[in-house]
Regions:
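Acidic helix-start/capping segments at beta-turn-to-alpha-helix junctions
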Residues: 1-6, 49-51
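Active-site regions of metal-assisted phosphoester/phosphodiester hydrolases
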Residues: 11-14, 18-207
Length: 207
């Protein structure tokens, strides 16, 4: 295991309930330090969710140009075991009057940890706030009907890709990736990484 990180780079906002210390090879800390060395200041937070590939502290980070005034550690899955790869958590941060949640959701057809149950937990927690953005890997294809993407739409959230005045083809996966290799369309292009807003925000571009 990597040694613990000494002093966290400037702008770090600890997430409540995070019991896993930052290590010297933490990627979010490396990005924060690189930006700091270039004279670009960001506020940031990091939340580990589980051990990935048996060696990594796999989690989520949010970087903000505005000061972070609050952070939230939300368990989305029924599983709450740091050594179990099906454990799902989301990191929420408040910057200004807006909350941002970065996510890595389970799959729609997972019998043990289905997307729908995780979405219900996330939607209730995030929906209680005024203006919210949900961003990250939803593991739900935007082009597939009747699954996770449509559930989010029916819940009243706005897809910022659709709201954008200018946008590219939208695909965030262009080849087979872990977690999708056994799917019939494993090599097909997909838009599983998305940004949703609790209201119809003005979006200039999505790319």
């Amino acid at each position: 295991a990597a040694p613990l990180l000494g002093d966290a780079p400037a702008g770090y906002y600890p997430c409540p309930g995070n019991r896993v210390p930052l290590k010297a090879d933490n990627h979010a800390a490396a990005v924060a330090r690189m930006l700091e060395q270039r004279g670009v200041h960001y506020y940031w937070s990091w939340l580990p969710a589980k051990v990935g590939y048996d060696i990594y502290d796999e989690g989520e980070a949010v970087f903000s140009r505005a000061p972070i005034t609050a952070a939230e550690n939300l368990l989305l899955s029924k599983t709450n075991d740091y050594s179990n790869w099906k454990t799902r958590r989301t990191l929420g941060v408040c910057a200004g009057d807006v909350w941002y949640y970065t996510v890595h959701m389970g799959w729609w057809k997972d019998e043990e940890e289905p997307f729908a149950a995780q979405w219900e937990t996330l939607s209730q927690a995030a929906g209680a706030k005024q203006t919210v953005f949900l961003l990250g890997d939803f593991n739900s294809e935007a082009d597939v009907r009747g699954e996770g993407y449509d559930l989010i739409l029916r819940s009243g959230w706005q897809d910022t890709y659709r709201l954008a005045q200018q946008r590219d083809d939208g695909y965030t996966v262009v080849q087979a990736i872990d977690g999708w290799r056994d799917a019939p369309d494993a090599a097909a292009k997909k838009r599983i990484d998305q940004i949703w807003c609790s209201r119809a925000a003005a979006v200039k571009s999505s790319r």
